[in-house]
Amino acid sequence: MSRPEGGKADAKGTSNLESGHSYPLRETIESIVVAVLLAFLFRTFVGEAFIIPTGSMAPTLQGNHKDVTCVECGYPYQASASSENDDLSYQETVGATTCPLCRFTMPLDLDLDEERQRFGLPTDREESGRAAKTDANHESFSGDRILVSKFSYDLSNPRRWDVIVFKYPNNAKQNYIKRLIGLPGETVRVRHGDVLIKPAGENDFRIARKPPHKLVGMLQAVHDTHYRSPELAEVGWPSRWQPGIGDGAAGWRTVADDEKLELPQADGESWLRYRHLIPSGDAWFKLLDGDKSVIPQPGATGGQLISDFYAYNAFTTVRAERDHDSPVPTPSVLGTHWVGDLGLEAEVTTTGNTGELILELVEGGVHFQCRIDLATGEAKLVVVDERLQFVDDAGQAATASPKAATAVRGGRRHRLRFTNVDDELRLWVDDSLATFDGPTTYVSPEDCRPHWRPDDLGDLAPAGIATHGASAQIERLRILRDVYYVAVSAELRSDSEYTDGTSDLAAVQMFADPESWSTTNLFARRRSVDFPLGEDQFFPMGDNSPQSKDGRLWGDPPYVERELLTGKAVLVYWPHAWSGPFRLPIPNVSRMRLIR
């Protein structure tokens, strides 16, 4: 009978044999202990994972939410589900959401017919036509899972516009996540949607400008020609891109089933201008009932101002103890503040190697243009108003028309992005930021408000694209807006930015009444609020400003001490998995991203 090598039946051999068996076990135990210690050290000193519970940072980061795709225009977006709860005495379910592009209020795939009946919706989904079909992804999902770097601020100081995690000053056991706005020693002013900063020892405020990569990450979609509602087209709802009044843009036409815009001939400047022609919830109901009386005529007064609408906030709920909840969002979530800081994106192909391509944005009645020479690629910025001029950081007048070399050439296809945000003009060509030979910054007037005249639509047509001496085909157009920070504070005991408590409905109605913009005192009643900071004090705000409980509303103290900072949010590493028949734990890889 053979024995294992080294397996002698003596004390020494037995000891060696037992040692040979126990070593792997001991190694395993030691490895587990080391792994636990490393994980503990990593969590304590290097990084930690968090789940976002609320939507105060939406749409940058998602709290508890629903992922939906609009059944009318096909646009994918998220809506809050943070209000849902399991309290049987006060059950609440998100039953409908509103698309940020076409504004269709879409009933979700509710499990119970009685819940659909509370919305006045057909229980036979095939019969309803507009109700979302059975979709497992209409269930509620937990928030984004993010990774937070704990040592970032050991190596360098926190920077403005970072997304930070910290301990809530009034409850150090609770973690908060916001965007860092104010730094130690500064006074932060929130005014007209912008952030202004007064550094320690200085007397004047200056606007805080977002770095380019932060700006791109914070812009929110208002319109996209890739997402069109067939229903609106069928009933004759006017396109949001219209010839400008007196611009002679009759040459523009749609091609390829209205998917593209084309200008076959180009004599002089030929303009297309954006009009914010969005159907209200009531208009949608009437259109679906066959009532076309609500269809607007663009004319000189059709459309409205762009507001701080958040799809994340525009949801309606079904409550167990109520017989009926209106599926139409209330005015408070339709956006009650005018947003003048906008961006225009265009995918365009020009023919020939002469002429100009012109991009335009309007704010406060001032026309800001970027004119690109199709022969040389030179881009030139122009302010079509004598009231404003470009200035440097010291406030001194700068080059009247700064120029930049770009890769744009006639006969090629390019992706262009032109923004007017934080009193600064920027241009991207094929995702590359153009560098101008002078400052592209300016100072807005204190009383900046929307302007309109019959011969100059101003802020009623806040974006435009044109050719001069050239022809072009446009494959895609997008309108984007900046975050609007609402000027409220705990001391004011009001969630309204307007000093006289103007109703949400009154503000929304005024946005659609351009003939009254010059006489109304609505825009003069916008308040500003200040927040002074001391040494090692930081001021945070959420990107979802209307629904964010942040430094503005904490009361005392309205800031975060340095010792309460946990770290910098750097990565969304595990967005929720898409639900399906097998419910595999596979994350939505397309939404894994660095946090900007």
Sequence positions of predicted segments:
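Extended hydrophobic leader/signal-anchor segments used for secretion and membrane insertion
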Residues: 1-596
